[in-house]
Amino acid sequence: MSISRQNTEAHLREEVCRAGRSLFERGYVHGTTGNISVKLPGDEGGFLIPPTDACLGFLEPEKLALVDAQGEQRSGERASKTLTLHRRIYQHAPEASCVIHTHSSWLVDLTLRGVWREQDIVPPLTPYFVMKVGHVPLVPYFRPGDVRVAEHVAQLIDTHRQRGLILRAVMCDRLGPQVWGSSTTATMAVLEELEETARLWLRSLNSGHPVAPLSEDAIEELRQHFKASW
């Protein structure tokens, strides 16, 4: 392994631990729920992911699992079973370098009460949701670790791309969101905007006066000015 790759891997290990601690401290995950993976750059590829049943708030860089591009573990403690799903996301969304899964309270609550639509779990309430998040379809309930989730998510990514839309997140019924992006920072920004929009939507429903979505004209303006994927 080159010195450059070693330095990059060491940096990404620290980044995963920082992101996990931030998510834990802010209540996006609890106990041993949730997961984060990152894709290593370069021809060798590979991934870093926390060990199975790890608490994201207390990750240790040296214990993260290093898995090669073929899915074989090379070092660290036993990789989380979530990697199967994350690898499919990376395969079908090559622009992604990070995938985050949480059990965010507002989003899980939304699936328990009933999402806005199966194709869009929340309506486009704000311009930043349209610009930074975009469509978020619902994945039907499967038990944790079921391989059918990976197949379902891959199909959703592909069908949206065929329509000229970039998917950045899906919502697993009763479990939580899977969100991906070009970096841990970008991925967390999508997650935060999605959770906040779910909170706004549920609060408006609880008030008895649901907020109207942005108009089609307003969304078209966001497409024209910011290339919003909606």
Predicted features and spans:
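Glycine-rich flexible loops
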Residues: 1-230
